[in-house]
């Protein structure tokens, strides 16, 4: 597989024996009106005017985790830390990792290098001030790293981040790098660890295997089979991701969106919570820092 120059691999990450078959459980903490698909309808300076459902939905996520006895990583917007610090503190109090999702869910390729630096530094500082813990990980809004952002990993490292999970090696109309490495690797010249979202190679294509709308769309048995296939054949952790709003079928409905956007956002929301609860019981899950960094620090 040909790697893009800006994603030159220094070396692959190798799972320590202690990692076993533990998979990475990740949650991107943003609300239903903050997703990239709705940004043409909802100005960021109007976010406080919308009904925010983050507290109740994060509570539901944490309750599911507690019932299953699992811990995970939460990529949290700095905006959430500013407006709902008690939510962030509960996440930490229950033993989960807090990582950064930027300040206001602005895609990296829509920022200049200086603006990106300011954004991720501010978000990290806010999250550390709220939690009293070092923030080590970052995830870009909407997987927004590509050839337009060759400076991004270097800036992340300079800002103090130790890993990124910002690349999805799939073909998609809004994001995705199908030719990117589909394994965790250290980025050459930056030194930071990049942990792509999980895909499964079938019929010459990378299929999205672990999270988001794909998990809602595919039958649970198929999703579970794809994840187990990754773990079994490639001997690496699965990186699963979702959002708190996906547990909320009663969320307010957006108007003025295309049929495709409506389908992608709302399909099978009512089935997501029981599916997630089952998945948490069926596979072994953990925090990204403990899996990939050994929680050293």
List the predicted regions and their residue ranges.
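Catalytic alpha-helical scaffold of carbohydrate-active enzymes acting on polysaccharides/glycoconjugates
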Residues: 2-203, 222-297
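Surface-exposed cleft-lining segments at the edges of enzyme active sites
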Residues: 207-217
């Amino acid at each position: 597989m040909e790697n893009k120059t800006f994603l030159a691999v220094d070396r692959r990450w190798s799972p320590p024996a202690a990692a076993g078959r533990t998979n990475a459980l990740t949650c991107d903490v943003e609300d239903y009106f903050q997703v990239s698909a709705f940004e043409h309808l909802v100005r960021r300076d109007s976010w406080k005017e919308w009904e925010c459902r983050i507290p109740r939905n994060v509570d539901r996520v944490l309750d599911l985790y507690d019932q299953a006895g699992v811990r995970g990583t939460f990529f949290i917007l700095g905006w959430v830390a500013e407006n709902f610090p008690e939510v962030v503190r509960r996440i930490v109090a229950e033993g989960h990792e807090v990582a950064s999702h930027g300040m206001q869910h602005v895609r990296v390729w829509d920022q200049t290098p200086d603006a990106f630096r300011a954004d991720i530094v501010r978000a990290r500082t806010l999250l550390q001030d709220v939690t009293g813990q070092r923030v080590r990980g970052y995830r870009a809004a909407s997987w927004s790293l590509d050839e337009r952002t060759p400076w991004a990993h270097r800036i992340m490292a300079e800002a103090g981040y130790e890993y990124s999970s910002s690349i999805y090696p799939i073909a998609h109309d809004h994001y995705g790098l199908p030719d990117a490495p589909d394994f965790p690797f250290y980025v050459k010249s930056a030194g930071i660890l990049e942990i792509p979202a999980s895909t499964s190679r079938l019929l010459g294509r990378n299929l999205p295997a672990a999270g988001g709308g794909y998990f809602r769309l595919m039958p649970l048995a198929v999703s579970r089979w794809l994840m187990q296939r990754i773990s079994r054949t490639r001997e690496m952790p699965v990186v699963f991701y979702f959002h708190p709003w996906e547990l909320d079928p009663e969320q307010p409905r957006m108007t003025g969106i295309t049929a495709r956007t409506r389908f992608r956002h709302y399909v099978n929301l009512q089935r997501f919570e029981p599916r997630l609860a089952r998945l948490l019981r069926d596979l072994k899950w953990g925090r990204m820092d403990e899996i990939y960094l050994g929680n050293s620090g």
